[in-house]
Amino acid sequence: MLRRLEEFAGRDLYVTGCMPLVQMDEIRSVCNPRVIHPDEIQERSGSIGTRGPGATGVVQVASGCAGRCSYCITRLARGRLRSAPAEAVLDAVRGLLASGAYEIQVTGQDVAAWGLDRGESFPDLLRGISGIPGRFAVRVGMMHPASVTGILDDLVEAFHSEKVFRFLHLPVQSGSDTVLERMQRGYTAADVIRIVDAFREEFPDMMISSDFITGFPGETDEEFQETLELLRRCEFVKVNVTRYSRRPGTPAAALKDLPERLRKERSRALLAEANRIYDRYNERWMGRVTPVVATEKNVPGSTVCRNPCYLNVVIRDDLPPGFSGRALITGNHRHYVIGELV
């Protein structure tokens, strides 16, 4: 990111997000941007809800984090968990629906932790959102496995609403208990399996995505194999793989890095396995007819739609945002499938 900022050093730059809160000296060494504090964005807009492209709307239900991961700079930048009041969230959703949104994306650094600082729980908030009258669907954002374990049964129950996409983003980071301990993630591989099995038992076609970090300091070949095994066991779809890089001021920054070559090799191996799982997941939809809703435009002559499991279905037709119908799935392009209206 610093290299990218340096490339644009001669232009008017605005920098926001977590980075300027903890790396301002480094930023000033390569450019002289105007800085907008993340909280200032909401203050200026006056709402925690924002319209996205097409028929999407985004609601940030919380900022900060309740975790203490040894490698993460977000906690240092954003501070402890701060949950938005439930009524503010519901008002934001109502406003987005009134503006024409269909897909409501509920976001935060850890959505499952919402309410811990207020004596409330996220499943109750999710039920409140899905109880709002209207035609829409909620995409629940990233949830830390440690936060999910304490609300698992109630969370699964809340996902039974037809207004909630059968989609879960569970950032696992590693499948090795010893690496997870060094990361200070607060859960084990067995906890992850329990979460995945609980959801898949209720929703067999559920899309569960994840994030992994390869080459964390001290990661052995055996520990990396444990990560591959967890990926295969849980069949995560849409996996984001990141090579570990140290963040200043974090406990892990003091640990000795693995060679970059090894981090790259493990990243490629993990991504290759994830892509095979992605293809298998898409293949299970081939020849099936599924409900779809148009959420955003693609290139001219095609439209991006979502099915109840948040499958990315491209219809080769110009459809208005919010259009609903049924589609026969005919083609697999890994990151999306092709559908034909029936």
Task: Give the role of each language-model region.
Residues 33-59:
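N-terminal [4Fe-4S]-dependent radical SAM core
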